[in-house]
C-alpha cells in the first residue's frame, strides 16, 4: 500500500514580549552615525554591526566567514533568519535580562539607553550591505514578530553636499533696508 500525502500549514509567528505591535518604521541614519563593527565571537564567523545616532540604534549579528578588511561586514544580501548559516543575519529571539537578543532596531532615551517602548525585534527580511568606494551602505527591509515593517537606510558614502534638497522653500525671508 502506498499513500500520497500532502500537508498544508500556515506558519504562525509567536509575538516577542515588548516588541512593537503597530506603527511601521522607515528611518534613515545620518552619514555621521556611529558605526561599530566587531568580530563578536572570534573564529566563529559572527560579526556584530551597530549603527546608532542620538535617537535610534540598530544591532545586527551577521553569520560571515571573515570580516571585510575595508568596511568590516562583507558586501552581500543577507536574509534574516535563525539558521546560523553563513551569509545570514541572526533573527531576534527575544529579550534577555540585559536586553534584546540578536538583531533589533530601537529608540534611545535621553541618556542613550534602549527605549523598550520603541523596540522592533527583527525576525524576517533582508539586509543588504554594499561597499561604495570604501564606505558602507546598508539597506534593511524587515519585519518584527508582529509583522510590522521596518525599513532602514544607512549610507556613509553620502555627503551633506550630495543630500541638499533641490525643491524651493515655501517661505521666503526678506530683510528690510
Task: Give the positions of each predicted feature.
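Hydrophobic residues embedded in beta-strands of well-ordered beta-sheets
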Residues: 136-138
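Edge beta-strand at a domain terminus
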Residues: 1-29, 62, 125, 140-177
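Surface-exposed helix/loop patches within compact recognition domains
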Residues: 28-130, 175-177
